[in-house]
């Protein structure tokens, strides 16, 4: 009997079981040992197959697909270092909650630790970073199909957050054989093959669904107090809902760039440096934080130093999310669900002077950046470039801080990022996944080092199903380090690492459109034309290296000098 045929039957059952748990997208890298999985994915009509030659980028492509679709996404790679390349995306998913299923083909046990080619110790390779790990045995008809499908159903039922690593050893041969062999093994599942449900319907009830643990019995008391709302990373609808909720309570809402709240008090990273604003916020009796991954340095400093009577943090993600370790309440619950259970009561705003400081800071930004074509000016005016019914992907490092500090995005406009571990690896690949999941017009904005780090992901952007603009802010290096007290003599060589490149040839190599505007009107016109003509265009904005960091520091100093407002 043929080992290759049974490998494929085993893999076909594995992939079909995953589709019963909502897996629609699967990302595949080339490899021989993964042949059973690849052929099974290609033959399954329920799966949309995405391919990429770089496993690190492939993992981030899956991450982006999972972010935007909110569905579990599977990945297939061959054995060896291909598996290790999935580590960065797996780590990010563990911190931000996207569900990834990593199917890593492996050599059979007898080929491990004996000098066999492309054979490494893959079991436990990812340490504690996966939420769950399953080490499957080598496929054999001695193991029932019921065992395999039940094992997968149980693991998928438990996967509420993060990654599932399924290690899949396959023995050779991997090709050929009589496809009719071992039909009885598959047929033992009966009409399950014609069904659409899991074999084992294991239900894991989140606590918030079967008992009112998320309900705060004293909410009706605290909603009458002076409160402050901090909005971190959350979904678009949650952001809209939170904005209306805080406004009804009369509580100031300090929104992160990823909060999708519309940042009703914009330029918070600036006005939070004002002493009087800090004095006002110190009067808060309760602080409610929704979502995590705060970007603003000044907001993080205030969040760390604040001492309200109560500090509540609401997020659907498990675990500790407060680096300041406040005494208070950690409520694991979706933001929208929590808001529905804790209705607001219309009250008079208690901290109206904060709006004055915010307006003054925004006016200072407009005055300072007037007539400039700079990194800071692009961040400030970014909302003007957004496509209708589209989405935004923001990179890490300096650009996301400038957008957070100087810009104001529309309430409820979808914004995506990799702000869990906040690495610059895989940003273009993640943006490609976000675009593919939604088929919406997409603006992605990253720095030059981020673009270089994931340059071969431009191959993924050739296949955009809707207009896409990759906006590369080329400040010649990692200029985030110009914001930090790095030693000046070593800053350029060891921190910023300028590369003195432009991206025109990269765009040509991958058959992408390209433009390099020299003014804001040119940039705006190029972007708007991209939304009309479709495809992917790389637009490069070349700016003076340290100007963005210097402008932010200058504005922070200027805003601290704004005259105090009488309470």
Curated annotation (Swiss-Prot):
Disulfide bonds: none annotated. The keyword Magnesium applies. It comes from Yersinia pseudotuberculosis serotype O:3 (strain YPIII). The lineage of its organism: Bacteria, Pseudomonadati, Pseudomonadota, Gammaproteobacteria, Enterobacterales. Its cofactor is Mg(2+); Mn(2+); thiamine diphosphate. Keywords: Magnesium, Manganese, Menaquinone biosynthesis, Metal-binding, Thiamine pyrophosphate, Transferase. InterPro entries: MenaQ_synth_MenD, MenD_middle, THDP-binding, Thiamin_PyroP_enz_TPP-bd_dom, TPP_enzyme_TPP-bd. It catalyses: isochorismate + 2-oxoglutarate + H(+) = 5-enolpyruvoyl-6-hydroxy-2-succinyl-cyclohex-3-ene-1-carboxylate + CO2. Pathway: Quinol/quinone metabolism; 1,4-dihydroxy-2-naphthoate biosynthesis; 1,4-dihydroxy-2-naphthoate from chorismate: step 2/7; Quinol/quinone metabolism; menaquinone biosynthesis. Homodimer. GO terms for biological process: menaquinone biosynthetic process. Catalyzes the thiamine diphosphate-dependent decarboxylation of 2-oxoglutarate and the subsequent addition of the resulting succinic semialdehyde-thiamine pyrophosphate anion to isochorismate to yield 2-succinyl-5-enolpyruvyl-6-hydroxy-3-cyclohexene-1-carboxylate (SEPHCHC). Pfam families: TPP_enzyme_C, TPP_enzyme_M_2, TPP_enzyme_N. Gene3D superfamilies: 3.40.50.970, TPP-binding domain. Belongs to the TPP enzyme family. MenD subfamily. The gene is menD. This is 2-succinyl-5-enolpyruvyl-6-hydroxy-3-cyclohexene-1-carboxylate synthase. Binds 1 thiamine pyrophosphate per subunit. GO terms for molecular function: 2-succinyl-5-enolpyruvyl-6-hydroxy-3-cyclohexene-1-carboxylic-acid synthase activity; magnesium ion binding; manganese ion binding; thiamine pyrophosphate binding. The keyword Magnesium applies. It is an enzyme of class 2 (transferase). Its EC number is 2.2.1.9.
């Amino acid at each position: 009997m043929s080992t290759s045929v049974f490998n494929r039957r085993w893999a076909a059952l594995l992939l079909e079981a995953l589709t019963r748990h909502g897996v629609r997208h699967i990302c595949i890298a080339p490899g021989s040992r993964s042949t059973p999985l690849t052929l099974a994915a290609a033959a399954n009509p329920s799966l949309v197959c995405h391919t990429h030659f770089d496993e690190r980028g492939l993992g981030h492509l899956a991450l982006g697909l999972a972010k935007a679709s909110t569905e579990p996404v599977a990945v297939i790679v061959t054995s060896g270092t291909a598996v290790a390349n999935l580590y960065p995306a797996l780590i990010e998913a563990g911190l931000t909650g996207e569900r990834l299923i990593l199917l890593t083909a492996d050599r059979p046990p007898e080929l491990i630790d004996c000098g066999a080619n492309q054979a490494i110790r893959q079991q436990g390779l990812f340490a504690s970073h996966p939420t769950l790990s399953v080490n499957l045995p080598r496929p054999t008809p001695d193991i029932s199909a019921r065992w395999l499908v039940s094992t997968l159903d149980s693991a998928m039922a438990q996967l509420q957050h993060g990654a599932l690593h399924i290690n899949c050893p396959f023995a050779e041969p991997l090709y050929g054989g009589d496809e009719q062999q071992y039909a009885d093994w598959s047929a033992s599942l009966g009409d399950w093959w014609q069904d659409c449900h899991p074999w084992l319907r294991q239900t894991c009830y989140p606590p918030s669904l079967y008992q009112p643990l998320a309900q705060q019995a004293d909410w009706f008391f605290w909603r009458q107090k002076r409160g402050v709302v901090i909005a971190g990373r959350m979904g678009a609808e949650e952001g809209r809902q939170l904005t209306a909720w805080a406004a009804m309570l009369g509580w100031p809402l300090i929104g992160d760039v990823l909060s999708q709240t519309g940042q009703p008090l914009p330029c918070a990273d600036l006005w939070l440096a004002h002493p009087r604003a800090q004095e006002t916020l110190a009067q808060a009796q309760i602080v409610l934080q929704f979502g995590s991954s705060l970007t603003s340095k000044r907001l993080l400093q205030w969040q760390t130093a604040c001492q309200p009577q109560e500090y509540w943090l609401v997020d659907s993600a498990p675990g500790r999310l407060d680096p300041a370790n406040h005494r208070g309440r950690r409520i694991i619950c979706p933001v929208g669900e929590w808001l529905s259970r804790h209705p607001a009561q219309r009250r008079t705003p208690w901290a109206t002077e904060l709006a004055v400081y915010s307006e003054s800071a925004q006016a200072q930004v407009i005055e300072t950046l007037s007539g400039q074509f700079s990194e800071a000016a692009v961040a400030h005016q970014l909302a003007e470039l957004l496509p209708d019914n589209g989405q935004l992907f923001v990179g890490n490092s300096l650009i996301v801080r400038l957008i957070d500090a100087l810009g104001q995005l529309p309430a409820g406009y979808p914004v995506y990022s990799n702000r869990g571990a906040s690495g610059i690896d895989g940003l273009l690949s993640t943006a490609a996944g976000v675009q593919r999941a939604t088929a919406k017009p997409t603006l992605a904005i990253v720095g030059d080092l981020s673009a270089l780090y994931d340059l071969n992901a431009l191959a993924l952007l050739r296949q955009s199903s809707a207009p896409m603009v990759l906006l590369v802010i080329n400040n010649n290096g990692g200029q985030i380090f110009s914001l930090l007290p790095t030693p000046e003599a070593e800053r350029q060589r060891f921190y910023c690492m300028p590369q003195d490149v432009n991206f025109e040839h990269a765009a040509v190599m991958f058959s992408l459109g390209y433009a390099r505007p020299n003014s804001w009107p040119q940039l705006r016109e190029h972007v708007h034309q991209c939304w009309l003509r479709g495809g992917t265009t790389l637009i490069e904005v070349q700016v003076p290296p340290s100007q963005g960091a210097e402008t932010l520091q200058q504005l922070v100093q200027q805003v601290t000098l704004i005259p105090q407002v009488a309470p």
